[in-house]
């Protein structure tokens, strides 16, 4: 169906004359992203956004956000979604799934109708914030009101906002069900129902909530499911709640082609030393370091700070306002390194991240796939390094087999061409709010000399309070500096194997 639509659209291209394209010249476009892209996003049919016959105001938002041409998942999804048909779409992490459902949702929303017309469900609060910002940015010329609502925030604020017109609601299932059950959120005319990361949303903890939410929608709703992985429970949902869905599967392989994967065998007590060595050898723009528990997240963040590196951390037990601040500031390039639990494995799109480190190796292939997908976003290059101990050997083999991928032993030196770009200033922060940008990732890659001379300090709560006592009042962010050497992963001309050296440095992150 998508190929037939593409053929028809190619026969009737819009915007071929000067009058039609002149409006483009008035747009305020961001700097062009000149990085090489893989076939994950370049293997398209050659369609343009104009070929979808969408509103000019929407196209203005699309181009001003830095989009140039639709990716494969967008080419397949958008024309079908615009017809109102149910969709079940499977595509890799970081290939443009969010825009694939946001664009048709915005196009089909009528700003003149003062009712909620679309509901977008996501599994985590951070992903809700990110997705709502995508909606607002792409739809900024449409006059559409977008609201984000998640648990961990005041219900009264949501009630006040819903007293005004809200066209699109983005949020987590529990909070939206609470609002709908109380009669605060009126979903009686909400004809678009979208689930991102659908495999997670249809897990046993969420499924009853999802089915209750559907009961508040009209019978003739459009249901769209998007994910990188679809377990059997998704088929059960499809058979029960979807009408002849159009199925899209772009998963000819599971892992992104631009991500190079390595493992290093290392004793548990030497992991922090190994991480320190990697920081000094790799040219990191931004990195995400994953741990398997919230306790280890905080312990590792503290240890990294004591080594002299700037570091934020985030996990599910933190206050929501602190999680939001960490996510916002890391996305805007305030800090180079983020330690987190699997809270941020789902859908989070920070294009400046070029290195992911599994400090703790994940227990299953699904988690591994989502973790390493935080680098190599939208067809770009990235590096995934796994610190493996003796007990992880079987999981390493099992994950390789399940994903059909090869995780190689880490070499004495890693070619920068695998994950570093010569012009880091071109790396965009998609959907960033220019008024809140502080220190972009491009500057991160160039400002180590200034940062090396900063005094080590811990930021408690907001960024205004600083204290030299790193060990107390931990609330989501550590900042560190070192008087000498490199900070945050700058290259040295030392080609020794990061795994070859040993240290007796004590660590607070030994396995429990």
Curated annotation (Swiss-Prot):
Its main location: cytoplasm. InterPro entries: DEAD/DEAH_box_helicase_dom, Helicase_ATP-bd, Helicase_C-like, P-loop_NTPase, RNA-helicase_DEAD-box_CS, RNA_helicase_DEAD_Q_motif. ATP binds at residues 91-98. It is an enzyme of class 3 (hydrolase). GO terms for cellular component: P-body. Keywords: ATP-binding, Cytoplasm, Helicase, Hydrolase, mRNA processing, mRNA transport, Nucleotide-binding, RNA-binding, Translation regulation, Transport. A motif (DEAD box) lies at residues 196-199. Residues 78-248 form the Helicase ATP-binding domain. Residues 1-24, 429-512 are annotated as: Disordered. CDD domains: DEADc_DDX6, SF2_C_DEAD. GO terms for biological process: mRNA processing; mRNA transport; regulation of translation. PROSITE patterns: DEAD_ATP_HELICASE, HELICASE_ATP_BIND_1, HELICASE_CTER, Q_MOTIF. The keyword Protein biosynthesis does not apply. It comes from the Eukaryota. It catalyses: ATP + H2O = ADP + phosphate + H(+). It is found in: Cytoplasm, P-body. Its EC number is 3.6.4.13. The Q motif is unique to and characteristic of the DEAD box family of RNA helicases and controls ATP binding and hydrolysis. ATP-dependent RNA helicase involved in mRNA turnover, and more specifically in mRNA decapping. Is involved in G1/S DNA-damage checkpoint recovery, probably through the regulation of the translational status of a subset of mRNAs. May also have a role in translation and mRNA nuclear export. PANTHER family: DEAD-BOX ATP-DEPENDENT RNA HELICASE 50 (PTHR47960). Belongs to the DEAD box helicase family. DDX6/DHH1 subfamily. This is ATP-dependent RNA helicase DHH1. It comes from Coccidioides immitis (strain RS). The gene is DHH1.
């Amino acid at each position: 169906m998508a190929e037939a639509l593409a053929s028809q659209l190619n026969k009737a291209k819009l915007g071929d004359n000067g009058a039609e394209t002149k409006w483009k010249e008035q747009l305020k476009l961001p700097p062009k992203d000149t990085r090489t892209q893989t076939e994950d996003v370049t293997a398209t049919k050659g369609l343009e956004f104009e070929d979808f016959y969408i509103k000019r105001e929407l196209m203005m938002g699309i181009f001003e956000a830095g989009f140039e041409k639709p990716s494969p998942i967008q080419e397949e999804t958008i024309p079908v979604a615009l017809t109102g048909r149910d969709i079940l779409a499977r595509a890799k992490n970081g290939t443009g799934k969010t825009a694939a459902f946001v664009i048709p949702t915005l196009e089909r929303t009528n700003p003149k109708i003062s009712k909620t017309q679309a509901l977008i469900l996501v599994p985590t609060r951070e992903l809700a914030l990110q997705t709502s910002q995508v909606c607002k940015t792409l739809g900024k010329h449409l006059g559409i009101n977008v609201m984000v609502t998640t648990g961990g925030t005041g219900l009264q604020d949501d009630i006040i906002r819903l007293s005004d017109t809200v066209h699109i609601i983005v949020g987590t299932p529990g909070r939206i069900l609470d609002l709908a059950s109380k009669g605060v959120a009126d979903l009686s005319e909400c004809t678009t129902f979208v689930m991102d990361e659908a495999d997670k949303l249809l897990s046993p903890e969420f499924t009853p909530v999802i089915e209750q939410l559907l009961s508040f929608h009209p019978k003739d709703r459009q249901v769209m499911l998007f994910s990188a992985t679809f377990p059997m429970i998704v088929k059960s949902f499809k058979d029960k709640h979807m009408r002849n869905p159009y199925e899209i599967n772009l998963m000819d392989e599971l892992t992104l082609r631009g991500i190079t994967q390595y493992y290093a065998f290392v004793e548990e007590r030497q992991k922090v030393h190994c991480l320190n060595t990697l920081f000094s050898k790799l040219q990191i723009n931004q990195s995400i370091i994953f741990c398997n528990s919230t306790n280890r997240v905080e312990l590792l963040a503290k240890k990294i700070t004591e080594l002299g590196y700037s570091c934020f951390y985030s996990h599910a037990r933190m206050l929501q306002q602190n999680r939001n601040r960490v996510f916002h500031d890391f996305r805007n390039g305030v800090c180079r390194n983020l330690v987190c639990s699997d809270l941020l494995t789902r859908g989070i799109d920070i294009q400046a991240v070029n290195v992911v480190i599994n400090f703790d190796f994940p227990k299953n292939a699904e988690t591994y796939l989502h973790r390493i997908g935080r680098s190599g976003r939208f067809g770009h290059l990235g590096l995934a390094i796994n610190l493996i101990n003796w007990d992880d050997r079987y999981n390493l083999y099992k994950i390789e087999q399940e994903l059909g991928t090869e995780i190689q032993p880490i070499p004495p030196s890693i070619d920068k061409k695998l994950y570093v770009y010569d012009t880091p200033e071109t790396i965009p922060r998609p959907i960033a709010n220019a008024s809140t940008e502080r220190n972009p990732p491009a500057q991160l890659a160039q400002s180590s000399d200034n940062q090396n001379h900063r005094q080590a300090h811990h930021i408690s709560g907001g960024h205004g309070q600083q204290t030299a006592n790193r060990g107390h009042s931990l609330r989501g962010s550590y900042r560190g500096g070192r008087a000498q050497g490199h900070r945050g992963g700058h290259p040295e001309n030392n080609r020794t194997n990061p795994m070859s050296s040993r240290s007796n440095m004590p660590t607070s992150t030994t396995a429990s």
